[in-house]
Regions:
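Alpha-helical linker/hinge and terminal dimerization helices associated
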Residues: 43-46, 67-89
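Secondary-structure junction motif
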Residues: 181, 189-211, 277-281, 285
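Short helix-boundary/capping micro-motifs
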Residues: 13-31
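Central regulatory/effector-binding core of bacterial HTH transcription factors
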Residues: 93-154
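A late-sequence structural motif
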Residues: 107, 255-292
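Hydrophobic hinge/microswitch elements
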Residues: 130-135, 139-142, 200, 205-256
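A short LG(V/I)-centered, amphipathic sequence patch enriched
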Residues: 43-60
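Flexible hinge/capping segments at coil-to-helix
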Residues: 89-90, 157-191, 195
């Protein structure tokens, strides 16, 4: 593969990371025909198709998966070398690829703001997705650091807790039902719940299983904001992270006093053991550990 270049790998990685040739061309400031030509050239060098169309979406072939892994290793090594050389010169640069579950989008920006001011030459790529999406990105080793409240159980992961995550029971502002009670006393009400698989839902389910509780009347809503607005409008009760309420009007919902609540777990920074951690990622992990 004598014709293989950093640029070809960079273009291919961008297509995978952004999900399409159009999005990659925009990210790389290249024309779509140029990106398509680079992809065709790389496919020719490999001698096999790198993508296939599945329901109108690009999906990597087995050969594409191998090339993507190679691209990550090669370009990651190049980036680390650049960072280390600049560090020796006293100049801090690099890229931090950060992927977080949806609820963590309320937690991470206040940490990123001072971090970016302290490290102005570090480029941050901030991805927000549901738990399944972030786990998929982690399995494909696409990012440096992942933020979960309920990380998957995997011996290949390093999980570092850095901040409490408190789940509270909320009700409409005009709620006049049971309060100062246990969760069982509220089970006659409709509960608005996150989807199965979300970190919030898993924490709630674990608690209910330990108490032998089942929600007889519930509605699944795949958005914290939508749940909060639905509670405000009187659709039902919910259990959400306190962080989702931080920037809402104080009278938009009522936080109930429920025995055993708030449920407390921790936000965790997760890295993959075999992935070499960039200097930028190391700096961010240090910033997380200094969060009060």
């Amino acid at each position: 593969m004598q014709s293989l270049t950093f640029r070809l790998l960079e273009v291919f990685q961008s297509i995978v990371d952004h999900g399409s040739i159009t999005a990659a061309s925009s990210a790389l400031s290249l024309s779509q025909p140029t990106v398509s030509l680079q992809l065709k050239k790389l496919s020719g060098i490999v001698g096999m198709p790198l993508f296939e169309q599945t329901y109108g979406q690009l999906k990597m072939t087995e050969a594409g998966e191998a090339v993507y892994q190679c691209a990550q290793e090669v370009l990651g090594s190049q980036s680390r070398l650049e960072s280390q050389v600049h560090a020796l010169k006293g100049v801090e640069i690099g890229t931090l690829k950060l992927a977080v579950v949806t609820t963590a989008k309320y937690v991470v920006p206040p940490i990123l703001s001072p971090f970016c001011k302290q490290h102005p030459n570090i480029e941050v790529r901030f991805i927000v997705g549901n738990r399944a999406d972030i786990i998929d990105r982690m399995r494909h080793n696409r990012d440096d650091v992942y933020i979960f409240s309920q990380p998957p159980q995997d011996d290949n992961l390093v999980c570092t807790p850095f901040m409490q995550n408190k789940l509270v029971v909320i009700a409409p502002p005009d709620y006049d039902g049971p309060d100062n009670c246990d969760l069982k006393a509220l089970m006659d009400h409709k509960f608005l719940l996150r989807e199965y698989g979300s970190g919030t839902r898993r924490a709630i389910q674990d608690y209910c299983d330990s108490k032998g509780l089942v929600f007889p009347n519930s509605m699944i809503i795949e958005s914290n904001e939508a749940i909060r607005l639905a509670v405000t409008s009187g659709l039902g009760l919910a259990i959400l992270s306190e962080h989702t309420l931080a920037h809402t009007p104080p009278d938009s919902v009522k936080v109930l006093k429920v025995k055993g609540f708030p449920l407390v777990n921790h936000w965790q920074a997760v890295t993959v053991k075999h992935r070499q951690i960039s200097l930028a990622a190391q700096a961010f992990q240090k910033a997380l550990l200094n969060v009060e």
